[in-house]
Amino acid sequence: MSMFRLMGASLLAMTVGAGAAMAETSKMRIALSNNYAGNSWRQAMLKSWDKITKKAVADGIVAEAPAFTTAENQVTEQAAQIQNLILQGYNAIVVNAASPTALNGVVKQACDAGIVVVSFDGIVNEPCAYRIAVDFKKMGRIQVEYMAGRLPKGGNLLEIRGLAGVFVDDAISAGIHEGVAKNPQFKIVSSVHGDWAQDVAQKAVAGVLPSLPPIAGVVTQGGDGYGAARAFAAAGRPTPLITLGNRSDELQWWKEQKTANGYETMSVSIAPGVSTLAFWVAQMILDGKQVPKDLTVPFLQINQDTLEKSLATTEKGSVANVEYSLDDAKAVAAGK
C-alpha cells in the first residue's frame, strides 16, 4: 500500500472515529415552530429568523429552515404542528412554545425520533430538549427596583402581563411580585393581560382604570407600555412611571415625553433575534458539538443615556434587536 493510500486510510479512520463531531449539516433541515405572531416582538423574531436562515441555506450550511406559526396561541394546535414536523422528517425543531409543560409529550416524541429540539423564549421543561432564555424573573425584579429608586415612598402599581399560559409571562410576573415583596412600600392593585401588544394593553388598561386608585407606576412585560400611556391619557389621568419594553413606538413616545416634560424611565426586553441564536444552537448540535441543555442570554436594557442611540437603530414598528452569528452561539455555549 502506498504511503498516500495509507495516510488516506488513516484519515478516514479518524473521521469515522470522530463520529457526530464531524457531522455534515448541509443536507439537514431545521424547522421553527412558533405559537404566536400577533405583536411587534414576534414579527421581529420571525424576520430575524428568516434573514439569518436564508443566508445559512444560501451558504450551504443547512438545506432549509422554514418557520411555521400557528393561527391561534393554542397548545393543541402547536402540538399537532410539531407532530407534522416530526412526520416530515426534520432533523431539528426550534420551538417558541405556548406552554412550558403541555408540549412535553410531543417534544419527547420528537426526541425519541432522533430529532434535536431547541426551545427559546417560551421554553419547554421536557429534559430531552434544549432551552435558551434570559433571566425573566430578574427582568421583572429590576423594574420594581427601578421604581423603588425613582419612587422611594412607593405607591400603587398596575401590572400588565403578557400572553397567558406562556413561560415568559409567568416568570416575569413572578419576578415583579418578588420585587414588590422586597419593597413593601409598593402595592399591586390590579393585573391585566396585554398580550405584549399595544392595542390589547391599551384596551385592558382602559377597562380597569375607572375602578383604580391613583397609580404611581406601571410594570410591564414589553409591547404594552405605550398602550398603557395612551389609556391613561384618554382617561385624563396623570401619566405614571411606566417601564417599557424596547418597542419603537414606546421608545419614540419616551423621547417625546422627555423633550416635553423631562419624563424619564427605563426599558427592557429579550432581543427578538434570540431566534437566530436558537437556530445556530440547533445547527451546532446537529454538527456534533457539545452544548449545555440550558443557556442563558442577557436581556437588552435601554436607559436614558442609551435611548437616542437605541431609537436610531430600531426599525419603525419593530423592536430594539440583536441578531446572533455562529461564532456568537459558540461563545454563548462556552459560557462566555
Task: Describe the residue ranges of each PLM region.
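A residue-level marker of the well-folded mature domains of exported/periplasmic proteins
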Residues: 22-336
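Gram-negative bacterial Sec-dependent N-terminal signal peptides
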Residues: 1-23
